[in-house]
Amino acid sequence: MADENLQPLFQIQRVYLKDLSLEQPNSPAIFLEQEQPTIEVAVDVGAQPLAEGIFESTVTITVTAKIADKIAFLVEGKQAGIFEIRNIPDEQLDPLLGIGCPNVIYPYLRANIADAITRAGFPPVHLSEINFEVFYQQRLEALAQQQADNSSGIVMADGSAARH
C-alpha cells in the first residue's frame, strides 16, 4: 500500500483558456486589401506551483498579420492547464513542465486562436505543430548564455546583469 503512494503521478486536472484578445486596428478598410498578409507567430511557455504537487502550466501565442505596413489583426491567447505531478525526480520536473504540459495544452490553444481569427472575418490561420523539446532546449541555452554574460553573478530586478 505504501508503494502506491510513491508511484510517479502525472494527471491533468483542468485545461482552460486563461486569456484571449483580438485587435483589428485597421478594420473595416483592411478587408478591402487584396494582398495576402504576412503572419508572425510568437510563443512563450510558463509554469508555476499552485500547491504541493499541483502546477499551472501556460502556453501563450501571439499571431500578428500585416498587409504592407498595416496590422490586419493581432491575436494573443494564453491556454493554461492545472496538473497534479507527484513523485517525479527533481531533474525531470522542469522538462515535464516545459515540454510535457505544453504538449497537452497547445492543441486547445491552437483551436481557440484559429476560431478567434475566423470569427473576426479573416481566412483561417493554421498554426503548425511546435516541438516543445527544441523550444525548451533553446530556452536553456539562452539562459546559460545570459548567465555566462553576467560577469558579477548578480542579476538586477529588471533581469539585467549588475555592472562594476
From Swiss-Prot:
Key word Transport present: yes
> Entry's InterPro entries?
SecB, SecB-like_sf
Gene Ontology CC annotations of this record: cytoplasm
Gene Ontology annotations of biological process type: protein folding; protein tetramerization; protein transport
> Which key words are in the record?
Chaperone, Cytoplasm, Protein transport, Translocation, Transport
Transit peptide as a keyword?
no
Q: What is its main location?
A: cytoplasm
Domain of life where this protein originates? Bacteria
Spell out the subcellular localization from the entry.
Cytoplasm
SUPFAM superfamilies listed in its UniProt record: SecB-like
Q: Which GO terms describe its molecular function?
A: unfolded protein binding
Coiled coil ranges (UniProt) are none
Annotated HAMAP family:
SecB
Q: Which family does it belong to?
A: Belongs to the SecB family.
Q: What does this protein do?
A: One of the proteins required for the normal export of preproteins out of the cell cytoplasm. It is a molecular chaperone that binds to a subset of precursor proteins, maintaining them in a translocation-competent state. It also specifically binds to its receptor SecA.
What quaternary arrangement does the UniProt entry report?
Answer: Homotetramer, a dimer of dimers. One homotetramer interacts with 1 SecA dimer.
Protein name, please?
Protein-export protein SecB
Tell me what gene encodes this: secB
